[in-house]
């Protein structure tokens, strides 16, 4: 596991965007051999999406031969609802880049049969072989995608009941009213995520400090699903200084020295 300890959340977005652009450009994707990118929603990746849009407009990267898969979607709210994850992705990213519509893959939270929809999504991912890079965020309780505490670490795309903590955290997007936050969601599984060639998780803010501690210094534990990153051969966590508050000083120092060349220009 790599840990990229930076000072500010804006630097996390800048570093993550540069890493994605390098991976895409080094891959040299074509229509027949696209780069497959997994994407999250939420507040944390917004700085990364903004930086990616700027790099695209500067001619540094094209998304024409990039295929995307999103992590999750609420069940039961209209696709055009302002807080659906479909709306989030188009508003904050897809509408500003040259990605082809047919290359965008999103879970359908209004499917007639949710189990069939989850299988369709898994099969679509498998049709590309694997996801080359999956970017994610993490919840205060260590959940990744909507894999809440006690989720199976070998789970696949499925329906999940959202915890009260998650619904309270997400109520800020629903006028502060938890009753407006859906109780269920479709989400990729931890096993689905671990199948990716590379996983990059963004962690910002002091409220994520316990989750970061569990991911880096704790044992692999289904109560902190982000800890499953320890099982992956190519995982990277990009964090800001407030998120490191629960880590040992020597842990932060170790990774700061290890990644010095990769963070010196930020």
Swiss-Prot record:
Alphabetical list of CDD domains matching this protein: GlcN6P_deaminase
Enzyme Commission number(s) from the entry: 3.5.99.6
Inhibition and activation profile: Allosterically activated by N-acetylglucosamine 6-phosphate (GlcNAc6P).
Keyword Hydrolase: yes
Key words of the record: Allosteric enzyme, Carbohydrate metabolism, Hydrolase
GO molecular function: glucosamine-6-phosphate deaminase activity; identical protein binding
Source domain of life: Bacteria
Catalysed reactions, as listed in the record: alpha-D-glucosamine 6-phosphate + H2O = beta-D-fructose 6-phosphate + NH4(+)
Pathway named in the protein's UniProt entry: Amino-sugar metabolism; N-acetylneuraminate degradation; D-fructose 6-phosphate from N-acetylneuraminate: step 5/5
Any one cellular-component term (Gene Ontology): cytoplasm
Site description Part of the allosteric site, residues in chain: 151, 158, 160-161, 254
Residues the record marks as active site: 72, 141, 143, 148
InterPro entries, A to Z: Glc/Gal-6P_isomerase, Glucosamine6P_isomerase, Glucosamine6P_isomerase_CS, NagB/RpiA_transferase-like
Pfam families: Glucosamine_iso
PROSITE patterns membership: GLC_GALNAC_ISOMERASE
Subunit-level organization: Homohexamer.
NCBIfam families, per database record: nagB, PRK00443.1-5
Purpose: Catalyzes the reversible isomerization-deamination of glucosamine 6-phosphate (GlcN6P) to form fructose 6-phosphate (Fru6P) and ammonium ion.
Family: Belongs to the glucosamine/galactosamine-6-phosphate isomerase family. NagB subfamily.
Protein name, as recorded: Glucosamine-6-phosphate deaminase
Lineage: Bacteria, Pseudomonadati, Pseudomonadota, Gammaproteobacteria, Vibrionales
């Amino acid at each position: 596991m790599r840990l990229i300890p930076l000072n500010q959340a804006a630097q996390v977005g800048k570093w993550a965007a540069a890493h994605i652009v390098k991976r895409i450009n080094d891959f040299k994707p074509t229509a027949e051999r696209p780069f497959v990118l997994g994407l999250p929603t939420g507040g944390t990746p917004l700085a990364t999406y903004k930086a990616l849009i700027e790099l695209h407009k500067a001619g540094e990267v094209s998304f024409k031969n990039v295929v995307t898969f999103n992590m999750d979607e609420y069940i039961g709210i209209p696709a055009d609802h302002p807080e659906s994850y479909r709306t989030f992705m188009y508003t904050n990213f897809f509408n500003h880049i040259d990605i082809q519509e047919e290359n965008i893959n999103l879970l359908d939270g209004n499917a007639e049969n949710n189990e069939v929809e989850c299988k369709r999504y898994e099969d679509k991912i498998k049709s590309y072989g694997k996801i080359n890079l999956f970017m994610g965020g993490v919840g205060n309780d260590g959940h990744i995608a909507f894999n809440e505490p006690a989720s199976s670490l070998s789970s696949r795309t499925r329906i999940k009941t959202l915890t009260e903590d998650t619904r309270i955290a997400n109520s800020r997007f629903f006028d502060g009213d938890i009753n407006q936050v859906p109780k269920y969601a479709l989400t990729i599984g931890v096993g689905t995520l671990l199948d990716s060639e590379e996983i990059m998780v963004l962690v910002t803010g002091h409220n994520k400090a316990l989750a970061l501690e569990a991911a880096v210094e704790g044992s692999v534990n289904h109560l902190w699903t982000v800890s499953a990153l320890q099982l992956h051969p190519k995982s990277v966590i990009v964090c800001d200084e407030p998120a490191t508050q629960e880590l040992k000083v020597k842990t932060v120092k170790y990774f700061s020295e290890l990644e010095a060349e990769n963070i010196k220009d930020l």
